[in-house]
């Protein structure tokens, strides 16, 4: 078979396959719910991140300090390009971790009214619970994020410690956004470019988030806003 004939045969097979897949869209996935899937987190790659260590299972080829990555797909968003997100929901989390000196690791999530939260002490930059474990106050921004190929998906952009100042500023900007009528913009009515910048103090250097509002609402961003609205409604209902 010559190359031209082989190419035509391949195209026909591909066309038939495409038709079959379209006709069977979603088949076999009926029993998979949100509880059965892992929500991706958006994180920054720092100097000691495992994503930079070639002998680590979490290593990502091509990753560099300051890049942002998706914890599920392992997609990298380069530092100066970043990722576009539309916020959908915000919530505070109070998370308990073992200290690294004790082995480290997540212990549990505390309720916002847990009395232990009001009984913490400071040891340098670490906030300690009465039992000696670390309390990490976290801002979780549920967002719709856009991948490099244009696909969009729910993600969690969580911020803690030095990132909290960025989160508070972002919340302030979202809370001050207005519609032409002067009414308050819904949380999913704005889109943002998330990149990173280098910060430093007497304890070292690290990368932190930088968020810039996108004023040009393209059809792609409109789609993200609609998805973010659906996400907000689902989360609000406990779905």
List each model region and its residues.
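Detector for methionine-enriched segments
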Residues: 1, 20, 37, 119, ...
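OB-fold ssDNA-binding interfaces and closely related basic DNA-contact patches used
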Residues: 1-150, 201-202, 206-208, 213-218
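Generic beta-strand structural signal
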Residues: 137-142, 153-155, 185-192
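Short acidic, glycine/tyrosine-flanked loop/strand segments centered on an H-E-D-like triad
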Residues: 142-177
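Long, compositionally biased interface segments
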Residues: 172-239
């Amino acid at each position: 078979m010559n190359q031209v004939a082989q190419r035509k045969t391949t195209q026909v097979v591909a066309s038939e396959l495409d038709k079959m897949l379209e006709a069977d869209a979603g088949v076999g996935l009926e029993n998979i719910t949100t509880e059965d899937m892992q929500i991706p987190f958006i994180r920054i790659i720092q100097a000691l991140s495992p994503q930079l260590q070639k002998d680590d299972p979490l290593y990502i080829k091509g990753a560099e300090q300051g890049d942002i990555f998706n914890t599920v797909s392992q997609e990298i968003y380069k530092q100066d390009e970043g990722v576009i997100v539309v916020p959908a929901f915000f919530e505070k989390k109070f998370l308990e971790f073992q200290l690294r000196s004790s082995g480290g690791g997540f212990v549990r999530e505390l309720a916002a009214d847990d009395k232990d939260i009001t009984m913490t002490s400071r040891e340098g930059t670490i906030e300690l619970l009465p039992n000696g474990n670390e309390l990490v106050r976290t801002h979780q921004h549920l967002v719709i994020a856009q991948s490099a190929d244009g696909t969009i998906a729910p993600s969690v952009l969580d911020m803690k410690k030095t990132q909290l100042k960025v989160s508070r500023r972002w919340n302030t900007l979202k809370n001050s956004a207005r519609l032409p009528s002067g009414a308050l913009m819904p949380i999913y009515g704005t889109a943002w470019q998330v990149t990173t910048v280098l910060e430093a103090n007497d304890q070292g250097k690290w990368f932190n988030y930088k968020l810039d509002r996108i004023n040009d609402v393209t059809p792609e961003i409109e789609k993200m806003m609609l998805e973010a609205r659906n996400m907000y409604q689902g989360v609000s209902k406990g779905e």
